[in-house]
Amino acid sequence: PVAAINGYHTCGSNDTLASAHPSDSRKGHDMTTSSVSPVTTELAGSETGITLVIHAGAGSRGKHSTPERIAQVELDLQRALDAGYQLLESGAPAHEAVVAAIHVMEDAPEFNAGRGAALTSDGIAQMDACLMTGDGEVGAVTGVSTVKNPIDAARAVKEQTKHVLFADPSDAEIADWGVATESNEYFITEQRRQSLAEAQSGGDEWEKHGTIGAVARDAEGNIAAGTSTGGITNQMHGRVGDSPLPGCSTFAN
């Protein structure tokens, strides 16, 4: 089985990866971080047993990083691992572990997904997410601006519709899916406002390396992968990147 999150073009040498699997030194869900390519994420874990790998994006260690921020990033990564791995230990399917881990990162303002997402040129958070399982079933959303956890909307597309990708789904569709919502202001942080102002004043306009993701293998050998992102700082409204496109940033087979 193969699962992958993010292509080479979205991973940089400062990307933060963390993995949890039975061969770790302590009880299964210890965190290890390294600067490795996405190929390594495909190979993490043992030939048998449960595995969880998460990816936080190099933006979490960008130019605004401080020792305190890096410490918070590492704490949130551990929380994400714990959330997903505990589900795998309890016998939950791989996709539930992926969603749980991504939830934690979407809720943490340090990452470019959910709360803390990069802002468009209009100053709003416009988010994308994708979830795929090893049986080929996939769901994705792009351009959501009020879904608290975009990965939930991607899961809803996968499980509740006959389609693969929804662009800017309506409020009625989101309500039918039963996913939690927030006003767009909820997603906007002061750091993201500053990043947008810098970009619009001639700074680093294309602040990249922000997609988060997770890959899991459950006790039955099933695999799943998911990604979530706020895109690129100062992107035009309506831009669609690779993150919600199956086979581009997310793949499980």
How would you describe each model-predicted region?
Residues T32-N253:
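Alpha/propeptide regions of enzymes that mature by internal proteolysis
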Residues P1, I5-C11, T16-D30:
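Short, Lys/Arg-enriched N-terminal segments with co-localized hydrophobic residues
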